[in-house]
Swiss-Prot record:
GO terms for molecular function: alpha-1,4-glucan glucosyltransferase (ADP-glucose donor) activity; alpha-1,4-glucan glucosyltransferase (UDP-glucose donor) activity. It catalyses: [(1->4)-alpha-D-glucosyl](n) + ADP-alpha-D-glucose = [(1->4)-alpha-D-glucosyl](n+1) + ADP + H(+). It holds the Pfam family Glyco_transf_5. This is Glycogen synthase. It comes from Rhodopseudomonas palustris (strain TIE-1). SUPFAM superfamilies: UDP-Glycosyltransferase/glycogen phosphorylase. GO terms for biological process: glycogen biosynthetic process. One of its GO terms (cellular component) is cytosol. Belongs to the glycosyltransferase 1 family. Bacterial/plant glycogen synthase subfamily.
Amino acid sequence: MTTLAVLSVASELFPLIKTGGLADVAGALPAALRANDVAVTSLLPGYPAVLGGIEDPQQVHSFNELFGGTARLLAARCGDLDLFVLDAPHLYVRPGNPYVGPDGKDWPDNGLRFAALAQVGAALGQGLLPHYKPDVLHAHDWQTGLLPAYLKYSGRPGPKTVFTIHNLAFQGRFPYELLGRLGLPERAFGLDGIEYYGGIGYLKAGLQLADRITTVSPSYAAEIQGSEAGMGLDGLLQLRADRLSGILNGIDTDVWNPASDALISATYDVESIAARARNKKVLQARFGLKPEPGALLYGVISRLSWQKGLDLLLQALPQLIGGGAQLALLGSGDAELEQGYAAAARKYPGQVGAVIGYDEALAHQIQAGADALLVPSRFEPCGLTQLCALRYGAVPVVARVGGLADTVVDANEMATATGVATGVQFAPVTTDALIKAFGKTRALFADVVAWRNLQINGMTTDVSWKNPAQHYAKLYRDLVAER
Protein backbone atom coordinates (compact mmCIF):
# COMPACT_ATOMS: atom_id res chain seq x y z
CA MET A 1 0.00 0.00 0.00
CA THR A 2 1.30 3.46 -0.91
CA THR A 3 2.25 5.58 2.08
CA LEU A 4 0.18 8.75 2.40
CA ALA A 5 1.79 11.95 3.64
CA VAL A 6 -0.39 13.98 6.01
CA LEU A 7 0.39 17.37 7.54
CA SER A 8 -1.38 17.74 10.89
CA VAL A 9 -1.72 21.36 12.03
CA ALA A 10 -2.60 22.02 15.66
CA SER A 11 -2.03 24.70 18.28
CA GLU A 12 -0.82 22.21 20.90
CA LEU A 13 0.71 18.74 21.00
CA PHE A 14 1.58 16.43 23.88
CA PRO A 15 4.20 16.06 25.32
CA LEU A 16 5.48 19.50 24.27
CA ILE A 17 2.52 21.74 25.16
CA LYS A 18 -0.91 20.83 26.55
CA THR A 19 -3.97 22.67 27.81
CA GLY A 20 -6.55 20.02 26.93
CA GLY A 21 -7.49 16.91 25.00
CA LEU A 22 -6.51 18.39 21.63
CA ALA A 23 -2.85 18.00 22.61
CA ASP A 24 -3.34 14.34 23.48
CA VAL A 25 -4.97 13.63 20.13
CA ALA A 26 -2.37 15.55 18.12
CA GLY A 27 0.43 13.77 19.96
CA ALA A 28 -0.89 10.20 19.87
CA LEU A 29 -2.61 9.87 16.49
CA PRO A 30 0.56 10.04 14.32
CA ALA A 31 2.09 6.88 15.81
CA ALA A 32 -1.15 4.95 15.37
CA LEU A 33 -1.46 6.11 11.76
CA ARG A 34 2.03 4.83 11.01
CA ALA A 35 0.69 1.28 11.25
CA ASN A 36 -1.80 2.21 8.50
CA ASP A 37 0.85 3.44 6.05
CA VAL A 38 0.18 7.09 6.84
CA ALA A 39 3.21 9.29 7.57
CA VAL A 40 2.23 12.31 9.67
CA THR A 41 4.28 15.46 10.15
CA SER A 42 2.86 17.93 12.67
CA LEU A 43 3.06 21.72 12.43
CA LEU A 44 2.75 23.67 15.67
CA PRO A 45 3.66 27.11 17.03
CA GLY A 46 7.09 27.77 18.53
CA TYR A 47 6.05 28.45 22.11
CA PRO A 48 8.97 28.48 24.58
CA ALA A 49 8.01 25.04 25.89
CA VAL A 50 8.01 23.67 22.33
CA LEU A 51 11.36 25.20 21.38
CA GLY A 52 12.83 23.85 24.60
CA GLY A 53 11.52 20.33 24.08
CA ILE A 54 12.30 19.53 20.44
CA GLU A 55 15.30 17.56 19.21
CA ASP A 56 17.66 18.39 16.34
CA PRO A 57 15.93 21.53 15.01
CA GLN A 58 16.98 22.51 11.48
CA GLN A 59 15.88 25.70 9.73
CA VAL A 60 14.16 24.81 6.46
CA HIS A 61 12.60 28.17 5.55
CA SER A 62 12.62 31.79 6.66
CA PHE A 63 9.95 34.50 6.47
CA ASN A 64 11.05 38.12 6.20
CA GLU A 65 7.61 39.25 7.31
CA LEU A 66 4.94 37.14 8.97
CA PHE A 67 2.21 39.18 10.66
CA GLY A 68 4.53 41.77 12.12
CA GLY A 69 7.93 40.14 12.38
CA THR A 70 10.44 37.69 10.99
CA ALA A 71 9.99 33.97 11.45
CA ARG A 72 11.68 30.65 10.78
CA LEU A 73 10.26 27.25 9.95
CA LEU A 74 12.13 24.49 11.75
CA ALA A 75 12.09 20.77 11.03
CA ALA A 76 12.56 18.81 14.25
CA ARG A 77 11.64 15.71 16.18
CA CYS A 78 10.17 14.89 19.57
CA GLY A 79 10.56 11.22 20.34
CA ASP A 80 9.02 9.44 17.36
CA LEU A 81 7.12 12.53 16.16
CA ASP A 82 8.18 14.39 13.01
CA LEU A 83 7.57 18.11 13.40
CA PHE A 84 7.57 21.48 11.74
CA VAL A 85 7.78 24.29 14.28
CA LEU A 86 6.88 27.87 13.38
CA ASP A 87 9.46 29.91 15.28
CA ALA A 88 7.96 33.40 15.39
CA PRO A 89 8.97 34.99 18.70
CA HIS A 90 6.79 38.07 18.19
CA LEU A 91 3.75 35.79 18.04
CA TYR A 92 4.49 32.89 20.37
CA VAL A 93 7.19 33.72 22.91
CA ARG A 94 5.28 35.17 25.84
CA PRO A 95 4.17 34.14 29.34
CA GLY A 96 0.89 32.47 30.13
CA ASN A 97 -0.61 29.56 28.26
CA PRO A 98 -0.91 29.44 24.45
CA TYR A 99 -4.17 31.38 24.36
CA VAL A 100 -4.36 33.65 27.41
CA GLY A 101 -1.98 35.89 29.27
CA PRO A 102 -1.11 35.84 32.97
CA ASP A 103 -4.15 38.05 33.58
CA GLY A 104 -6.45 35.28 32.31
CA LYS A 105 -7.54 37.26 29.24
CA ASP A 106 -7.14 36.18 25.62
CA TRP A 107 -4.09 37.63 23.92
CA PRO A 108 -5.47 40.55 21.86
CA ASP A 109 -3.58 39.39 18.76
CA ASN A 110 -4.80 35.77 18.84
CA GLY A 111 -6.42 36.33 15.46
CA LEU A 112 -3.02 37.04 13.89
CA ARG A 113 -1.12 34.46 15.93
CA PHE A 114 -3.22 31.59 14.65
CA ALA A 115 -3.78 33.00 11.18
CA ALA A 116 0.00 32.69 10.84
CA LEU A 117 -0.14 29.02 11.79
CA ALA A 118 -2.93 28.37 9.27
CA GLN A 119 -1.22 30.34 6.52
CA VAL A 120 2.05 28.46 6.90
CA GLY A 121 0.17 25.15 7.00
CA ALA A 122 -1.53 26.02 3.71
CA ALA A 123 1.80 27.10 2.21
CA LEU A 124 3.37 23.77 3.15
CA GLY A 125 0.51 22.08 1.35
CA GLN A 126 1.21 24.12 -1.77
CA GLY A 127 4.91 23.39 -2.07
CA LEU A 128 6.63 25.85 0.26
CA LEU A 129 9.37 23.24 0.66
CA PRO A 130 10.48 21.52 -2.55
CA HIS A 131 11.13 18.21 -0.79
CA TYR A 132 7.78 18.01 1.04
CA LYS A 133 4.36 17.56 -0.55
CA PRO A 134 1.59 16.27 1.71
CA ASP A 135 -1.40 14.44 0.24
CA VAL A 136 -3.80 15.71 2.94
CA LEU A 137 -3.82 18.64 5.36
CA HIS A 138 -5.51 17.85 8.68
CA ALA A 139 -6.40 20.97 10.68
CA HIS A 140 -7.63 20.95 14.27
CA ASP A 141 -10.05 23.37 15.96
CA TRP A 142 -10.60 27.10 15.48
CA GLN A 143 -6.91 27.98 15.68
CA THR A 144 -6.41 26.37 12.25
CA GLY A 145 -9.82 27.16 10.78
CA LEU A 146 -8.43 29.63 8.23
CA LEU A 147 -6.18 26.97 6.66
CA PRO A 148 -8.71 25.86 4.02
CA ALA A 149 -9.49 29.54 3.36
CA TYR A 150 -5.84 30.27 2.56
CA LEU A 151 -5.89 27.32 0.16
CA LYS A 152 -9.16 28.28 -1.52
CA TYR A 153 -8.40 31.96 -2.05
CA SER A 154 -4.78 31.52 -3.13
CA GLY A 155 -5.85 30.60 -6.66
CA ARG A 156 -3.36 27.73 -6.66
CA PRO A 157 -4.04 24.00 -6.36
CA GLY A 158 -3.49 22.33 -3.03
CA PRO A 159 -4.15 19.07 -1.23
CA LYS A 160 -7.43 17.90 0.26
CA THR A 161 -8.33 19.12 3.74
CA VAL A 162 -9.82 17.56 6.85
CA PHE A 163 -11.01 19.81 9.67
CA THR A 164 -11.61 18.28 13.10
CA ILE A 165 -13.84 19.87 15.73
CA HIS A 166 -12.62 19.01 19.20
CA ASN A 167 -15.00 21.43 20.91
CA LEU A 168 -17.57 23.55 19.06
CA ALA A 169 -17.84 25.93 22.01
CA PHE A 170 -14.52 27.56 21.12
CA GLN A 171 -15.13 29.35 17.83
CA GLY A 172 -12.37 31.91 17.26
CA ARG A 173 -14.52 34.95 16.46
CA PHE A 174 -12.83 38.22 15.49
CA PRO A 175 -13.98 41.61 14.14
CA TYR A 176 -14.28 42.35 10.42
CA GLU A 177 -11.51 44.94 10.75
CA LEU A 178 -8.97 42.12 11.04
CA LEU A 179 -9.60 41.05 7.44
CA GLY A 180 -7.18 43.57 5.96
CA ARG A 181 -4.33 42.08 7.98
CA LEU A 182 -4.96 38.40 7.18
CA GLY A 183 -3.71 38.33 3.61
CA LEU A 184 -7.09 37.14 2.33
CA PRO A 185 -9.09 38.90 -0.41
CA GLU A 186 -12.25 40.85 0.33
CA ARG A 187 -14.27 38.18 -1.48
CA ALA A 188 -13.34 35.71 1.29
CA PHE A 189 -15.67 37.69 3.54
CA GLY A 190 -19.01 36.14 2.67
CA LEU A 191 -21.50 33.55 3.85
CA ASP A 192 -19.73 30.94 1.73
CA GLY A 193 -16.37 31.97 3.21
CA ILE A 194 -15.13 33.23 6.55
CA GLU A 195 -17.92 35.68 7.47
CA TYR A 196 -19.86 34.85 10.63
CA TYR A 197 -22.49 37.22 12.06
CA GLY A 198 -20.76 40.28 10.65
CA GLY A 199 -17.31 39.28 11.87
CA ILE A 200 -14.75 36.63 11.01
CA GLY A 201 -15.31 33.10 12.27
CA TYR A 202 -12.21 30.92 12.23
CA LEU A 203 -14.08 27.76 13.24
CA LYS A 204 -16.87 28.60 10.81
CA ALA A 205 -14.32 29.00 8.01
CA GLY A 206 -12.98 25.53 8.64
CA LEU A 207 -16.47 24.03 8.68
CA GLN A 208 -17.46 25.90 5.51
CA LEU A 209 -14.38 25.28 3.40
CA ALA A 210 -12.74 21.98 4.42
CA ASP A 211 -13.27 18.99 2.15
CA ARG A 212 -14.25 16.81 5.09
CA ILE A 213 -15.26 17.60 8.66
CA THR A 214 -14.79 15.24 11.56
CA THR A 215 -15.55 15.46 15.21
CA VAL A 216 -14.48 13.20 17.99
CA SER A 217 -17.48 10.93 18.51
CA PRO A 218 -20.49 9.79 16.47
CA SER A 219 -22.97 11.04 19.08
CA TYR A 220 -21.40 14.51 19.16
CA ALA A 221 -21.49 14.64 15.34
CA ALA A 222 -25.25 14.11 15.57
CA GLU A 223 -25.77 16.45 18.54
CA ILE A 224 -24.07 19.47 16.94
CA GLN A 225 -26.54 19.38 14.06
CA GLY A 226 -29.24 20.37 16.57
CA SER A 227 -29.86 23.79 18.09
CA GLU A 228 -28.97 22.82 21.67
CA ALA A 229 -25.41 21.64 20.98
CA GLY A 230 -24.88 23.38 17.62
CA MET A 231 -23.75 26.67 19.19
CA GLY A 232 -25.17 28.68 16.28
CA LEU A 233 -23.46 26.51 13.66
CA ASP A 234 -26.09 23.76 13.47
CA GLY A 235 -27.52 25.09 10.20
CA LEU A 236 -24.16 24.97 8.47
CA LEU A 237 -23.43 21.53 9.90
CA GLN A 238 -26.78 20.26 8.63
CA LEU A 239 -25.94 21.59 5.17
CA ARG A 240 -22.60 19.78 5.27
CA ALA A 241 -23.88 16.64 6.97
CA ASP A 242 -22.75 14.46 4.06
CA ARG A 243 -19.18 15.64 4.69
CA LEU A 244 -19.35 15.28 8.49
CA SER A 245 -18.48 12.17 10.48
CA GLY A 246 -17.64 11.26 14.05
CA ILE A 247 -14.51 9.27 14.85
CA LEU A 248 -13.90 8.41 18.49
CA ASN A 249 -10.64 9.39 20.09
CA GLY A 250 -8.36 6.86 21.67
CA ILE A 251 -5.73 7.24 24.36
CA ASP A 252 -2.04 6.44 24.34
CA THR A 253 -2.12 3.02 25.98
CA ASP A 254 1.63 3.10 26.58
CA VAL A 255 1.34 6.28 28.63
CA TRP A 256 -1.89 5.08 30.25
CA ASN A 257 -1.00 1.54 31.28
CA PRO A 258 -1.61 0.51 34.91
CA ALA A 259 0.73 -2.46 34.50
CA SER A 260 3.76 -0.23 33.88
CA ASP A 261 2.75 3.26 35.04
CA ALA A 262 5.66 4.82 36.93
CA LEU A 263 3.39 7.60 38.24
CA ILE A 264 1.21 5.34 40.41
CA SER A 265 2.04 3.76 43.76
CA ALA A 266 1.24 0.17 42.80
CA THR A 267 1.09 -1.26 39.29
CA TYR A 268 -1.53 -3.88 38.39
CA ASP A 269 -3.40 -5.43 35.49
CA VAL A 270 -6.74 -7.11 34.93
CA GLU A 271 -5.44 -10.23 36.69
CA SER A 272 -4.38 -8.29 39.78
CA ILE A 273 -7.08 -5.67 40.26
CA ALA A 274 -6.94 -6.18 44.02
CA ALA A 275 -3.65 -4.24 43.99
CA ARG A 276 -5.70 -1.10 43.31
CA ALA A 277 -6.43 -1.07 47.05
CA ARG A 278 -2.90 0.18 47.70
CA ASN A 279 -3.42 3.04 45.26
CA LYS A 280 -6.70 3.90 46.96
CA LYS A 281 -4.98 4.10 50.35
CA VAL A 282 -2.30 6.43 48.96
CA LEU A 283 -4.94 8.55 47.23
CA GLN A 284 -6.98 8.91 50.41
CA ALA A 285 -3.88 10.05 52.27
CA ARG A 286 -2.95 12.50 49.50
CA PHE A 287 -6.38 14.16 49.64
CA GLY A 288 -6.75 14.05 53.42
CA LEU A 289 -9.60 11.53 53.26
CA LYS A 290 -10.43 8.99 55.95
CA PRO A 291 -8.47 5.76 55.35
CA GLU A 292 -11.59 3.65 54.90
CA PRO A 293 -11.04 0.85 52.35
CA GLY A 294 -14.78 0.18 52.14
CA ALA A 295 -15.82 3.77 51.34
CA LEU A 296 -16.85 4.40 47.73
CA LEU A 297 -14.20 6.84 46.49
CA TYR A 298 -15.14 9.01 43.52
CA GLY A 299 -12.45 10.76 41.52
CA VAL A 300 -12.79 13.87 39.35
CA ILE A 301 -10.13 15.11 36.93
CA SER A 302 -11.59 18.06 35.09
CA ARG A 303 -11.66 21.65 34.07
CA LEU A 304 -13.99 23.30 36.58
CA SER A 305 -16.65 24.77 34.33
CA TRP A 306 -20.34 24.85 33.48
CA GLN A 307 -19.71 22.62 30.44
CA LYS A 308 -18.20 19.95 32.65
CA GLY A 309 -21.23 19.98 34.98
CA LEU A 310 -19.08 20.64 38.02
CA ASP A 311 -21.66 23.07 39.40
CA LEU A 312 -24.16 20.18 39.48
CA LEU A 313 -21.73 18.01 41.41
CA LEU A 314 -21.13 20.80 43.91
CA GLN A 315 -24.89 21.03 44.49
CA ALA A 316 -25.15 17.25 44.90
CA LEU A 317 -22.24 16.89 47.34
CA PRO A 318 -24.44 16.61 50.47
CA GLN A 319 -26.15 13.55 48.96
CA LEU A 320 -22.83 12.03 47.89
CA ILE A 321 -21.42 12.50 51.38
CA GLY A 322 -24.67 11.39 53.01
CA GLY A 323 -24.36 8.08 51.20
CA GLY A 324 -20.98 7.49 52.82
CA ALA A 325 -18.90 8.19 49.72
CA GLN A 326 -15.71 10.22 49.37
CA LEU A 327 -14.54 12.63 46.67
CA ALA A 328 -11.01 13.37 45.41
CA LEU A 329 -11.10 16.25 42.93
CA LEU A 330 -8.28 17.61 40.77
CA GLY A 331 -9.01 20.58 38.54
CA SER A 332 -8.98 24.29 37.90
CA GLY A 333 -11.12 26.75 36.01
CA ASP A 334 -13.95 29.05 37.06
CA ALA A 335 -12.97 30.95 40.19
CA GLU A 336 -16.41 30.44 41.73
CA LEU A 337 -16.16 26.66 41.35
CA GLU A 338 -12.56 26.60 42.58
CA GLN A 339 -13.69 28.44 45.71
CA GLY A 340 -16.74 26.19 46.03
CA TYR A 341 -14.72 22.98 46.06
CA ALA A 342 -12.08 24.42 48.37
CA ALA A 343 -14.90 25.36 50.75
CA ALA A 344 -16.44 21.88 50.42
CA ALA A 345 -13.13 20.30 51.41
CA ARG A 346 -13.15 22.45 54.55
CA LYS A 347 -16.81 21.68 55.26
CA TYR A 348 -16.46 17.92 54.81
CA PRO A 349 -12.98 17.09 56.15
CA GLY A 350 -12.04 13.49 55.58
CA GLN A 351 -14.76 13.07 52.97
CA VAL A 352 -13.99 15.69 50.31
CA GLY A 353 -10.50 16.57 49.11
CA ALA A 354 -9.71 19.11 46.40
CA VAL A 355 -6.46 20.00 44.68
CA ILE A 356 -6.94 23.15 42.60
CA GLY A 357 -4.62 23.03 39.59
CA TYR A 358 -3.35 20.28 37.34
CA ASP A 359 -0.82 17.58 38.18
CA GLU A 360 -0.23 14.81 35.63
CA ALA A 361 1.15 12.36 38.19
CA LEU A 362 -1.79 12.97 40.50
CA ALA A 363 -4.20 12.44 37.60
CA HIS A 364 -2.67 9.00 37.09
CA GLN A 365 -2.94 8.20 40.81
CA ILE A 366 -6.63 9.19 40.82
CA GLN A 367 -7.33 6.83 37.92
CA ALA A 368 -5.47 4.05 39.73
CA GLY A 369 -6.96 4.62 43.18
CA ALA A 370 -10.50 5.92 42.77
CA ASP A 371 -13.29 3.35 42.73
CA ALA A 372 -15.30 5.42 40.25
CA LEU A 373 -14.61 8.42 38.04
CA LEU A 374 -17.28 11.12 37.75
CA VAL A 375 -17.80 12.93 34.42
CA PRO A 376 -21.10 14.88 34.68
CA SER A 377 -20.58 17.02 31.55
CA ARG A 378 -23.47 18.93 29.97
CA PHE A 379 -21.83 18.25 26.61
CA GLU A 380 -18.70 16.28 25.84
CA PRO A 381 -17.36 15.94 22.30
CA CYS A 382 -15.43 12.78 23.22
CA GLY A 383 -13.83 12.93 26.62
CA LEU A 384 -10.56 11.24 27.48
CA THR A 385 -10.71 10.81 31.25
CA GLN A 386 -13.44 8.17 30.99
CA LEU A 387 -11.28 6.21 28.52
CA CYS A 388 -8.40 6.30 30.99
CA ALA A 389 -10.81 5.27 33.74
CA LEU A 390 -11.90 2.21 31.76
CA ARG A 391 -8.26 1.29 31.23
CA TYR A 392 -7.49 1.65 34.96
CA GLY A 393 -10.56 -0.07 36.40
CA ALA A 394 -12.09 3.12 37.81
CA VAL A 395 -15.75 2.66 36.92
CA PRO A 396 -16.93 5.72 34.93
CA VAL A 397 -20.12 7.45 36.05
CA VAL A 398 -21.01 9.74 33.17
CA ALA A 399 -23.68 11.94 31.65
CA ARG A 400 -25.34 10.37 28.60
CA VAL A 401 -23.96 12.88 26.10
CA GLY A 402 -21.50 12.90 23.19
CA GLY A 403 -18.52 10.64 23.45
CA LEU A 404 -19.42 9.64 27.00
CA ALA A 405 -22.54 7.93 25.66
CA ASP A 406 -20.49 6.25 22.92
CA THR A 407 -17.72 4.86 25.13
CA VAL A 408 -19.37 3.79 28.40
CA VAL A 409 -21.87 0.91 28.41
CA ASP A 410 -24.48 1.66 31.06
CA ALA A 411 -25.12 -1.00 33.68
CA ASN A 412 -28.80 -1.27 32.79
CA GLU A 413 -30.72 -4.51 33.10
CA MET A 414 -29.93 -5.72 29.57
CA ALA A 415 -26.21 -4.86 29.64
CA THR A 416 -25.80 -6.38 33.10
CA ALA A 417 -27.60 -9.57 32.08
CA THR A 418 -25.42 -9.97 28.99
CA GLY A 419 -22.24 -9.07 30.87
CA VAL A 420 -21.16 -6.09 28.75
CA ALA A 421 -21.67 -3.13 31.12
CA THR A 422 -18.67 -0.93 31.87
CA GLY A 423 -20.10 1.95 33.90
CA VAL A 424 -23.08 4.12 34.81
CA GLN A 425 -24.80 6.67 32.58
CA PHE A 426 -27.35 9.24 33.71
CA ALA A 427 -29.76 11.54 31.90
CA PRO A 428 -30.91 14.25 31.79
CA VAL A 429 -27.90 16.24 32.97
CA THR A 430 -29.44 17.57 36.17
CA THR A 431 -28.62 17.48 39.86
CA ASP A 432 -31.50 15.08 40.52
CA ALA A 433 -30.34 12.64 37.85
CA LEU A 434 -26.79 12.82 39.19
CA ILE A 435 -28.03 12.04 42.71
CA LYS A 436 -29.91 9.02 41.35
CA ALA A 437 -26.68 7.91 39.66
CA PHE A 438 -24.97 8.04 43.06
CA GLY A 439 -27.58 5.61 44.37
CA LYS A 440 -27.19 3.26 41.41
CA THR A 441 -23.40 3.36 41.72
CA ARG A 442 -23.58 2.70 45.46
CA ALA A 443 -25.76 -0.38 44.88
CA LEU A 444 -23.38 -1.73 42.25
CA PHE A 445 -20.37 -1.07 44.51
CA ALA A 446 -22.03 -3.05 47.29
CA ASP A 447 -22.27 -6.07 44.97
CA VAL A 448 -18.64 -7.22 44.87
CA VAL A 449 -19.12 -9.52 41.88
CA ALA A 450 -21.06 -6.97 39.82
CA TRP A 451 -18.47 -4.26 40.53
CA ARG A 452 -15.55 -6.49 39.63
CA ASN A 453 -17.28 -7.39 36.35
CA LEU A 454 -17.61 -3.69 35.52
CA GLN A 455 -13.90 -3.23 36.20
CA ILE A 456 -12.86 -6.24 34.13
CA ASN A 457 -15.07 -5.20 31.22
CA GLY A 458 -13.62 -1.70 31.31
CA MET A 459 -10.02 -2.84 31.53
CA THR A 460 -10.45 -5.21 28.58
CA THR A 461 -12.12 -2.58 26.37
CA ASP A 462 -9.91 -1.44 23.50
CA VAL A 463 -9.46 2.29 24.14
CA SER A 464 -6.29 2.55 22.05
CA TRP A 465 -5.82 4.54 18.86
CA LYS A 466 -5.88 1.37 16.73
CA ASN A 467 -9.51 1.59 15.55
CA PRO A 468 -9.68 5.41 15.30
CA ALA A 469 -6.47 5.42 13.25
CA GLN A 470 -7.97 2.93 10.81
CA HIS A 471 -10.99 5.23 10.37
CA TYR A 472 -8.79 8.29 9.78
CA ALA A 473 -6.59 6.39 7.32
CA LYS A 474 -9.67 5.34 5.33
CA LEU A 475 -10.96 8.93 5.38
CA TYR A 476 -7.65 10.23 4.02
CA ARG A 477 -7.50 7.61 1.27
CA ASP A 478 -11.12 8.20 0.27
CA LEU A 479 -10.39 11.93 0.03
CA VAL A 480 -7.31 11.47 -2.12
CA ALA A 481 -9.26 9.12 -4.40
CA GLU A 482 -11.85 11.89 -5.02
CA ARG A 483 -9.38 13.96 -7.01
